[in-house]
């Protein structure tokens, strides 16, 4: 009998692979890998955030917004998740919600120029 459990990657390995795919410009493939990681560890904010990034970069903004919202729910002090949720909300017509999350991101990390630019862009 062959034991194949050693061949099955765990959530951490899948997260690492997904992040690598994102860094190398392959968001679609990253979304597939990170989706598998989410099935293994659905309450890990880091997986939800990375999956949200992959989905956002793949053009699946509504799905990305859901992942970022879950990441924020799991880890409310995750400034990047608030930032990304704000961007996703802005792209899906939820301006008020976008501003709220972008303000939180800026408050959590005032030195992040990208956060401030995004807030200014949405606020008008």
Label each PLM-derived region with a short phrase.
Residues 1-3, 99-124:
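Terminal, low-structured helical/coil segments at or just beyond the last alpha-helical repeat
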Residues 8-40:
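Alpha-helical segment of the N-proximal tetratricopeptide repeat
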Residues 24-36, 58-70, 92-104:
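Structural signature of tandem alpha-helical TPR/SEL1-like repeats
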């Amino acid at each position: 009998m062959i034991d194949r459990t050693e061949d099955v990657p765990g959530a951490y390995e899948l997260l690492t692979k997904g992040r690598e795919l994102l860094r190398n410009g392959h968001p679609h493939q990253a979304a597939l890998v990170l989706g598998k990681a989410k099935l293994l560890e659905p309450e890990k904010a880091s997986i939800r955030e990375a999956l949200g990034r992959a989905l956002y970069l793949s053009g699946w903004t509504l799905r990305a917004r859901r992942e970022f919202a879950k990441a924020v729910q799991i880890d409310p002090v995750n400034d990047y998740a608030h930032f990304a949720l704000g961007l996703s909300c802005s792209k899906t017509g939820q301006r008020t919600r976008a501003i709220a999350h972008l303000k939180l991101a800026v408050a959590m990390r005032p030195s992040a120029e990208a956060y401030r630019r995004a807030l200014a862009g949405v606020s008008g």
